Each structure stands twice: as structure tokens, then as C-alpha cells.
Design a protein with these regions (language model features):
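Intrinsically disordered, low-complexity, positively charged segments
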Residues: 1-25, 29
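Short, glycine/acidic-enriched loop or turn micro-motifs at the edges of active sites
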Residues: 188
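Buried, small/hydrophobic-residue-enriched core segments of structured protein domains
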Residues: 29, 35-44, 53-58, 62-184
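Structured beta-strand/loop patches that form or line metal/cofactor-binding pockets in enzymes
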Residues: 47
Length: 188
């Protein structure tokens, strides 16, 4: 299970600003009573969930919302989006960590994530799934996740060959040196 912390933060801080309500009013789809309700919205329900980091199984309830139907409907999509994304990442990370048979696995998903927030919360979810750290510096700062990484592929392009680039990187970072093969020249 991953994402519960973000779900709780979302629900605690959910509100509709004057600008939000004014935009909705401009759509001409909603009654003034509903818009007035939104302008004073505060979630009053209860959330029950299994703890983050727990193993989850198919058809197992992860989270239960007990609230008036209107409130539950207003938070449903966000809850599903958050939990679906982070549980997916944590599950995949757990499988990779298991396959590594005790070797540490680092998370480097930011460049492939579907947006900065997905990269940020994906890094957190990967660590919940067992990764030992992340290349995402903001995730390290926000979630106290160990930071680790490698050089950029462009690092190698600034040298005459891979060997020279690796040697210089190892000189600069003797205690934290992990080198990447330059993918366009991997056969060399």
C-alpha cells in the first residue's frame, strides 16, 4: 500500500476558492445552492485504510470512506488516482527488489514519469516498495528518502571516450561512484 499520506493531505486541504466556484458558476451547469455548498466545503467524513507499506492482494479493500455521499463523490477520483499510481509503483518496485535477491535497487523514475508530481510521489512509492534510494532530490528533501545517482549521459559526451569520463567521475566521487554505459555506444 502506498499513497495514503498524499490522500490524507489532499482530503485535509481540499477546498474550493472563490475563483474555483466562480469558474464553475460560469459553466452554467450547477445550482447556486451547490456552488454555495462548495464555497464552504470541508470534508467531515472518516477514512479507514491499511497502513502504508502493507502487502496488498487482489480484491482486498485498501481504503474505506465513510461520509455523506456528496463528500465521498467529491474525493473519490482523487483518491483512486493517488492510490492507483503509487500502489502500482510500489508493487513494481517490490518485485524488482525481490528479484535482486538482496542487492540494493535505486529508483531513477523521474525522467520517465508522467509529470513532476508523478515523479515525486513515484519516488516515494518506490522506496515504500523496497528501493534503497532515489535520484529525485526533491523527494529526498520532502520525504527524507536517501539520495543517490549517477552522472548524466551528457557527462560522457564531454569527454573523448567512456573510459576517460568514468575515470574522471570516479575521481570526483570516489565514495559514491555509479557509472552509466553510454547507450548510443554500448557495444564499445
Amino acid at each position: 500500500m502506498a499513497g495514503l499520506d498524499q490522500v490524507i493531505d489532499y482530503i485535509k486541504n481540499l477546498n474550493f476558492s472563490y475563483e474555483d466556484v466562480d469558474y464553475l458558476r460560469g459553466l452554467g451547469l450547477f445550482s447556486e445552492d451547490f456552488l454555495h455548498y462548495l464555497s464552504g466545503f470541508h470534508f467531515s467524513g472518516d477514512i479507514y485504510a491499511i497502513p502504508e507499506g502493507s502487502v496488498i492482494f487482489p480484491r482486498e479493500p485498501l481504503l474505506k470512506v465513510v461520509a455523506p455521499i456528496m463528500e465521498a463523490q467529491l474525493v473519490e477520483t482523487a483518491i483512486l488516482t493517488i492510490l492507483n499510481h503509487q500502489c502500482l509503483i510500489a508493487t513494481k518496485a517490490s518485485r524488482v527488489v525481490y528479484a535482486a535477491q538482496g542487492d540494493g535497487i535505486m529508483e531513477f523514475g523521474l525522467r520517465r514519469a508522467q509529470g513532476p508530481d508523478a515523479g515525486l510521489y513515484g519516488a516515494r512509492a518506490a522506496v515504500i516498495g523496497g528501493c534503497v534510494g532515489t535520484s529525485n532530490v526533491l523527494a529526498g528533501e520532502m520525504f527524507d528518502v536517501p539520495i543517490m545517482g549517477t552522472h548524466a549521459h551528457s557527462w560522457i559526451m564531454t569527454f573523448k571516450d567512456e573510459y576517460t569520463a568514468f575515470k574522471e567521475y570516479a575521481r570526483l566521487y570516489p565514495d559514491a561512484c555509479t557509472c552509466l554505459l553510454y547507450t548510443s555506444d554500448a557495444a564499445d
